Amino acid sequence: MPAGDQLVAVVNGQDIPLQMDVKTTYADGSVNNAILTVALPAIAANGAVNIMLATNSAPAAATPAVNAESILQQQSYDLSVNVNIHNADGTTTDYNVNAAQVVEQALQNGTAQSWLSGPLATEVLVTTNITSTLQATFDVRTMANGQVYTDVIFGYDNAYTVNNSNLTYDLDIQNNGQTVYSQTDMTQYQHTSWQTAVWSSGAAPTLNTVYDVPYMVSTGDIPAIDTSQQVSAADVEANYAALNASNTCPMGTALLTTYMGGTGQTD
């Protein structure tokens, strides 16, 4: 998108609120990659809405960004992480991280890393140490409608320390005093990270985005996919059933082949 232009979202001929956070640009200032946030109109159960994106050279009206600290206070944001580390000598060590407190302090002292900032959504990342090698990152998105989404990321990926081994721990993540995610005797391997999402409403939205593939091909945005080639519904159902029966927990291998000596194949 050319530098200086604005992006608008159109539904039934009417512009709807859109926020664009530009992440990378080309040398001439035009947009290469951006994250779009759209305020959708009400959609009936099992309904659908078509959204068209278009450019507009008119300057966007200045609107204040969502105040993350204010939204978190309004929603009484209360997220905590409890980790029980299994030590090599058979003992255990408990650690507790009050995510709400960690995020609030980072917002107040300016150390929170900004990812999105606009009138529809503000997103920040805050990282804290659980142990000397295990870190928790809270990727907190606050939205204008009051919703709060937190991506909790556990990183055991410090490559500059010695004598590390796999880490085994029990985990309990609580939102407003209620357990929303837990694991027992989970082993996290060296140099890995994993994540889980928590919504303030308790349940993730059930929206499903369907892209206009032929149009995207025509613009050169994606390679020329032959959409006449169909995938067997039976194959999709079989793979879905196999995935559900596999280990999809953190550090699980799901349907991946763990043997590295093969020549590789594509189904």
Spans of features found by a protein language model:
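Alpha-mannosidase-like glycoside hydrolase catalytic domains involved in N-glycan trimming
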Residues: M1-N96, V102-T127, R141
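Catalytic cores of extracellular degradative/oxidative enzymes
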Residues: G118-P119, T127-D267
